[in-house]
């Protein structure tokens, strides 16, 4: 199981359903897709929002999974 990490949403495009998270540990920004957001109803994130997540290897590099608002 991947380690839970924390960070802040750098930006998220609701129309396209994706964005990036800045990691608290200073690592590279992580891609996030709306399907990875753990919530009910419309899945979106706000710029600057604090989140926890795991990192998985996606088709084009690191990708956030199990994204939960803090």
Curated annotation (Swiss-Prot):
**Alphabetized UniProt keyword annotations:** Activator, Cytoplasm, DNA-binding, Transcription, Transcription regulation
Gene Ontology BP term (one): regulation of gene expression
**Entry superkingdom:** Bacteria
Listed under GO cellular component are:
cytosol
List residues of the CSD domain.
Answer: 7-67
Q: Which residues form a coiled coil?
A: none
Spell out the CDD domains in the cross-references: CSP_CDS (cd04458)
Subcellular localization:
Cytoplasm
Q: Provide the protein name.
A: Cold shock-like protein CspA
Q: Which organism is it from?
A: Vibrio cholerae serotype O1 (strain ATCC 39315 / El Tor Inaba N16961)
Q: What taxonomic lineage is listed for the species of origin?
A: Bacteria, Pseudomonadati, Pseudomonadota, Gammaproteobacteria, Vibrionales
Protein encoded by which gene: cspA
